[in-house]
Amino acid sequence: MKILYAASEATPFAKSGGLADVAGSLPKALVKDGVDARVIMPLYGDLKFRDKLEYVTNYSVPVGWRSQYCGLFKAEVNGVTYYFLDNEYYFKRRGLYGFYDDGERFAFFSRAVLETLFYIDFTPDIINCNDWQTALVPVYLNLYYRHLDKFNRIKTIFTIHNIAYQGKYGTEILEDTCGIGRRDQHIVEYDGCANFMKGAIETADKITTVSPTYAQEILDPWFSYGLDALLREKQYKLCGILNGIDMEANNPATDPHIAFNYDVNNFEEGKAKCKEALQDKFGLNKDGSPVFAMVSRMVGMKGFDLVQSVADGLVDRGIELVILGSGESQYENFFSDLCGRHPGRVGTYIGFEPALSQEIYAGADAFIMPSKSEPCGLAQMVACRYGTPPIIRETGGLRDSIHDCTLGEGNGFTFAGYSAHELYDACCRAQDRYYSKEDWNNLIRYDMECDFSWDVSAKSYEGLYNETANLW
């Protein structure tokens, strides 16, 4: 089985969000299992390890009525071949996204992915495209390449990581930049504009999301950002596969950033020392109170409005809070002020430091994640890996990965409704369980033994790839 994984970012080369972690981890797990999986992505100006890349060739790529240069480079990391598409006009910039011509940049990239196959000794069975930045790949394949022998058996899978970002532009981009004539523009047009994601949903052989629950949620108007009717029509080719985490990178037994390394056999000593170090760093009291933490962007979608409503009540109940993140000023200001109102009980760091986030995962007693919507979420899995039971709202991948321990065997505390009252109740249940040492230690042990590795997810993807490759 040959897989070409097309993504706009991938670790360790370029990252702005969770897509990079998936693109860096899933192909590695597939290769480990004997699949010939390769990654193709843009060669950004601030790409890491640029000096390690090997030049392959260059060629022209159609962009509407004109052609643009494309240079091809490659590298191999962890047994995975990475291809990098170079065009300084489009990609030699500071940052990955947020430019006025993003539509043109990624229309070029999508077309270049297919053109590249003429110049490498690799014809994939499946091209797995990811989010709107690669959404035109299946559109272009069906319109301009399907009749060629090299392409007529290639199948496409489109993975939706976050349906909120669809790649919407004025319809004038379709002919001038994408080169799609009026006869075919209906494939990409939606609600009066060009919608790249809509084009992929129409033309890809299969559609996946990053969790089974999210695959069901996006059929509902509340979650779909306008695409629910189309997705219900295409539901026969939609499924959800839960993402995994890198179990090697997130390992409390070897993590160099935490105060004391531990595993499932000595977590009591290890977490106690990590908690003490965390309390020292944030100036918190060491009076036996549980420490509940959040590591997140400070935006409403992550449930910060709920946390804002219950924070004072949780502190008054004897819970210490640690918050790491940045985002909307109303939340940054609130949690900064919260420290002043509750000295020794609340610690806030505005910004993001990867090493500090690992210290929090290891040192906190519980991890709060009350998202309004969460396609998959990785933080709750990392928290389990470090023996820090999550408190989550039942949505998307949170619902698929965390199950309430008060209902029997589970690895955290959950609530269903998007309300401050339900979040407060879940936190109180976690606090009550914390003071029952034997029950709490059993929960930590259960969490640390959960298998959220990419090996599990890769098996599901392999099944999907085999099913898709056998479609007529």
What does each model-found stretch correspond to?
Residues 1-472:
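Catalytic cores of nucleotide-sugar-dependent glycosyltransferases that transfer UDP/GDP/TDP-activated
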